[in-house]
């Protein structure tokens, strides 16, 4: 019995040590933080019904390397693309006038901010620069190493030199991921 308790304690300690959380904030909080310490913003646009969004949360955003890198170099925003939050951003108010509370956990109307960025699929990760200017949408599920490419691309401003699809393809082919893929299942 003692061995089982020790083994269980060790397993739980290992899970706790390996667990890392991204410090999620609202878009408005990120804008306020920008004024004190400018960083790029990584905004996860998700929905409650989206399976790949849940997988992104579980497998990628819970990854220790991803969480550490994001927390160090970005403000991370979680935004429900079909939610009913009212957002003040870029001297505008964004809401979801078509929101139906009865459909809160299923497909709902798109939020105005979602439409503002032209997001039509979930998950989509939107990157904004330190001046809150739109950099790019990254659509679909990405594992930690796939997301690493974009995190480092925008952090290092390498995207500014990639003016053609061929240049991006070369960057993609030569990129050497460093993040470890771990299972959180």
Where are these regions (language model features)?
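Detector for the c-type heme attachment site
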Residues: 54-58
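Bacterial Sec-dependent N-terminal signal peptides
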Residues: 1-21
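A short beta-strand-turn-helix
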Residues: 23-40, 70
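Solvent-exposed coil/turn segments that connect beta secondary-structure elements
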Residues: 48, 81-82, 131, 143
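A short, hydrophobic beta-strand/beta-hairpin element that forms part of a small beta-sheet core
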Residues: 76, 97, 113-116, 121-138
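Short active-site neighborhood of thiol/selenol oxidoreductases, capturing the structured segment around
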Residues: 37-51, 76
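Non-globular targeting/processing and membrane-anchoring segments
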Residues: 20, 35, 118, 129, ...
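Thiol-based oxidoreductase modules, predominantly thioredoxin-like and allied folds used
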Residues: 21-24, 63-105
């Amino acid at each position: 019995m003692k061995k089982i308790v020790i083994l269980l304690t060790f397993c739980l300690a290992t899970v706790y040590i390996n667990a890392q959380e991204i410090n999620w904030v609202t878009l408005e909080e990120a804008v306020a933080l920008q004024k004190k310490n400018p960083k790029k913003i990584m905004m996860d646009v998700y929905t409650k019904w989206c399976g790949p969004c849940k997988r992104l949360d579980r497998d990628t955003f819970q990854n220790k390397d991803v969480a550490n890198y994001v927390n160090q170099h970005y403000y991370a925003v979680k935004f429900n693309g079909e939610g009913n939050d009212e957002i003040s951003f870029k001297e505008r108010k964004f809401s979801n006038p078509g929101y139906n509370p009865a459909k809160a956990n299923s497909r709902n109307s798109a939020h105005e901010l979602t439409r503002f960025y032209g997001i039509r699929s979930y998950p989509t990760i939107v990157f904004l620069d330190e001046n809150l200017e739109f950099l790019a949408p990254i659509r679909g599920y990405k594992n930690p190493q796939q997301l690493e490419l974009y995190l480092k691309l925008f952090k290092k401003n390498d995207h500014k030199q990639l003016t053609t699809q061929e240049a991006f393809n070369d960057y993609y082919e030569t990129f050497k991921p460093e993040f470890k893929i771990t299972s959180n299942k």
